[in-house]
Amino acid sequence: MTIWVLSLAMKNTIYHAPLTFGLYALAGVLFALYTSRVCPFLATLSTREIATQVGAVFILAWLIRHTLLRQHIWARKQQFIQLDTALLFAMSLPLALYYNLQYQFTLDSNLKVLFGMTLFGFFTGALLQLSSKLRTLRQMPQSQNLALSSDERRSLVKQLIGLIVLLISTLTVMLSMVAIKDIHWLENNPARLLDGSGKISIVKEFAFLSLVLGGYITAILVLWSRMMKEILDHQERSLQAVTQGNLQVRLPVYSNDELGNVAMLTNQMLDSLEATQNEVKTTRDVAIVSLSALAESRDNETGAHILRTQEYVKALAEYLAAFPQYSTLLTPAYIELLYKSAPLHDVGKVGIPDSVLLKPGKLTDEEFTVMKEHPRIGAQALAIAERHLGTSSFLAIAKEIALTHHEKWDGTGYPAQLQGEAIPLSGRLMALADVYDALISARVYKPAFSHDKAKAIIVEGSGHHFDPAVVEAFLAVEEKFVAIAAHFKDAA
């Protein structure tokens, strides 16, 4: 029976007429069997009488549930335990009154009718409520966050204790009623006790009630455990996203209980962490702009050069990220760090004398030797910041770019004559971006080259000055380079 009840319950949304009818039909059949086993007076009625009377009451109850109560506030709040328990209790009153007037049943028999229908109403409502909430959880988008309801907080521990107490009490009451009924029956049928058939009948009745109660209890516990697993799985997936650095994720809050409160407090903590992270990022960006502006103030380079080169680097990185050999390194977070760090590639120029840095003509060999020190100066400055502020991905990438963006693929660059993949990818990307922008920009010692001419020079340098893979990426996104150059033009 447990499997059948579960299969019905899992078809539910918030309200499902066939499901409700199926569970009401099941409750009606079981109640009809229940009555003949707990009440000696009801046991005197024929199967046809009980089936007709109980069937009529349960069909009427379902019709009321289907028409008048489907939009009831309890139904809209998925509080089906209250709704179905109250409905079947109300329907048990006229049935008990009918038995009292038609068959002169005693008060205890009438109370057994009230108890039985109310009990099956509780079980039916519990299955409908749990299955409805489970389906809602499974259909709800992972990103949707619900506020805690304004209802009074319901403790999971108290709910479990209450359910266990209710089930134990129900089992005790029902078995007691069966025992009393069987004692009455044996008193009037002593021969059944002597021939042993009475014992078998009593065992069957106890087994029937245990099976019915056990089936409902098992179905309720299975649905409840599935709902808890769904909630915990959702929260675990959210926390896994947080551990990967996504502080915009929030834990879904499904209920006003301990789990809901933990999720709400966790979300408040994530709000605070996100605000702190945003403040740190803002401070970092201000530092980047300040350092970049300092370098610009001593160089002939313009602010637009800084903007263009970081956009070039981002375009190249996003293209290469689509390839398996680069996808592990070039994650969205890493590309964002590249983009933020790129403006610091020439920060070391603040340590170059003005006589060299601002010289309008060609540098002498001695002057060029001095100029070639700016990558080391920039990397050393960022290393000092790293020692004082602690290691961070941003400072590490900024230091890489500053130190290696003048290295060449064939090992003829500076300052360390690194060759091939010994040059960090960040430096290889910036090398092409920096040269391209220098080629298309006007300087006191040269006019601005066209995109096509700059492109030809870069292609010629593939495998010598530049990483061939980066050159291929440049050719694939050259239209983006043209658009970036047009958007961030030097001021006239």
UniProtKB/Swiss-Prot annotation:
InterPro entries, per the entry: Cyclic_di-GMP/3'3'-cGAMP_PDE, HAMP_dom, HD/PDEase_dom, HD_GYP_dom, MASE10
Catalytic reaction equation(s): 3',3'-c-di-GMP + 2 H2O = 2 GMP + 2 H(+)
UniProt KW Transmembrane keyword: yes
Pfam family, one: HD_5
Gene Ontology cellular-component terms listed: plasma membrane
Topology in membrane: Multi-pass membrane protein
Residue ranges of domain HD-GYP in the record: 280-490
Keywords per UniProt: c-di-GMP, Cell inner membrane, Cell membrane, Hydrolase, Membrane, Transmembrane, Transmembrane helix
Domain HAMP residue range list: 226-278
Subcellular location per the Swiss-Prot or TrEMBL entry: Cell inner membrane
Positions of transmembrane segments: 14-34, 49-69, 80-100, 111-131, 160-180, 205-225
Protein's GO biological process: signal transduction
Gene3D superfamilies assigned to the protein according to its UniProt record, in alphabetical order: 6.10.340.10, Hypothetical protein af1432
EC number(s) stated in the UniProt entry for this protein: 3.1.4.-
Enzymatic class: hydrolase
Database matches in PANTHER family: CYCLIC DI-GMP PHOSPHODIESTERASE TM_0186-RELATED, CYCLIC DI-GMP PHOSPHODIESTERASE VC_1348-RELATED
The protein's name: Cyclic di-GMP phosphodiesterase VC_1295
Source organism per UniProt: Vibrio cholerae serotype O1 (strain ATCC 39315 / El Tor Inaba N16961)
Lineage, top ranks: Bacteria, Pseudomonadati, Pseudomonadota, Gammaproteobacteria, Vibrionales
